[in-house]
UniProtKB/Swiss-Prot annotation:
It comes from Xenopus tropicalis. Signal peptide: none annotated. GO terms for cellular component: plasma membrane. This is Cyclin-Y-like protein 1. It comes from the Eukaryota.
Length: 343
């Protein structure tokens, strides 16, 4: 009845499985600063906000972890975009924006790609273009042995000695990724998560994606994203059947190294996912990879409304499941009593 607030926690209670996985991290054990109390012999559970971070962590946040940070691929592409605009201005070349369709009061042009259901073909094009800019505008050629295609070839064909000197073009990267996504029947959301894991690997491991390692890095990111995102994940042996010449042992070893370099951080917040989606759309606009626009018809409007209602109902169900109902002491007078039946 006073102003004292108490909280009862069973000393035998164990954290939830999902929370335990979220705070598990490979590396040196975290030394939590705990003030031991004689009256509280229960175990201390580390909260995710209690983690220790580097001194410059908040100065340069990782874009794959924080929605406020700008994506790496978009910043690397700005140099080429500015050069293209400058060249078009000097040569009096139209950038192609005159053919773009704009909405009016009577007609609305929309594409079939949304943040919840992106277009597969357009998304793969944008993701591979982002990988292309990563390779082209890399700072150096830092790499690791596990990703070196010369030491771990994906095919039986001998890798040329000057393989690391020739940057792959966008079409080459697109064909490689499209083959994997088509054979494994992966979704467009998986492609976006693949790019998140790729940039997280480059940041955490402090390496660069270059001609000698890009295929194995992309393959490892796709492998991990397909297992995390899709309900029916593709097995490692399935990728071996797609690529033919790679062994299961090599796939397992690469996956293990990939997870260790990510410090087992495979979480992708919704805000980070949305940021990557819209930055990919910006990348497409800057490089004239426009999405297919069609006039909004009555049928398409009803379809979009149905998709919106489906997502809204889904989020409502999740919020209701997570909601905890409680009754305060102020409403004790208004509690309804069950009606008694007198026979």
């Amino acid at each position: 009845m006073g102003n004292t607030v108490t909280c009862c926690v069973s000393p035998d209670a164990s954290p939830k499985a999902g929370r335990d996985r979220a705070v598990t991290e490979r590396g040196e054990p975290y030394q939590a600063q705990v003030e031991l109390q004689e009256t509280d012999p229960g175990p201390h559970l580390q909260h995710i906000s209690d983690r220790e971070f580097p001194v410059d962590f908040h100065d340069e946040p990782n874009p794959s972890d924080h929605p406020q940070a700008s994506t790496i691929f978009l910043s690397k592409s700005q140099t080429d975009v500015r050069e293209k605009r400058k060249s078009n201005h000097i040569n009096h070349v139209s950038p192609g924006q005159l053919t773009k369709k704009y909405s009016s009061c009577s007609t609305i042009f929309l594409d079939d790609s949304t943040v919840s259901q992106p277009n597969l073909r357009s998304t793969i094009k944008c993701v591979t273009l982002a990988i292309y800019y990563h390779i082209k505008n890399r700072d150096s050629d830092r790499s690791l042995e596990i990703f070196d295609e010369k030491l771990h070839p994906l095919t039986r064909e001998e890798v040329a000695d000057d393989y690391c000197k020739h940057d792959p073009d966008h079409k080459h990267i697109y064909r490689f990724v499209r083959t994997l996504f088509s054979a494994a029947q992966l979704t467009a959301e998986c492609a976006i998560v693949t790019l998140v894991y790729l940039e997280r690997l480059l940041t955490y491991a402090e390496i660069d994606i270059c001609p000698s390692n890009w295929k194995r890095i992309v393959l490892g990111a796709i492998l991990l994203a397909s297992k995390v995102w899709d309900d029916q994940a593709v097995w490692n042996v399935d990728y071996c059947q797609i690529l033919k010449d790679i062994t299961v042992e090599d796939m397992n070893e690469m996956e293990r190294h990939f997870l260790e370099l990510l410090q087992f951080n495979i979480n992708v917040p919704a805000s980070v996912y949305a940021k990557y989606y819209f930055d990919l759309r910006s990348l497409a606009d800057d490089n004239n990879l426009s999405f297919l626009l069609e006039p909004l018809s009555k049928e398409r409007a009803q379809k979009l409304e149905a998709i919106s209602r489906l997502c809204e109902d889904k989020y409502k169900d999740l919020s209701k499941a997570a909601m905890r109902r409680s009754i305060s002491a102020d409403n004790l007078v208004g509690i309804r009593r069950s009606n008694a039946i007198i026979s």
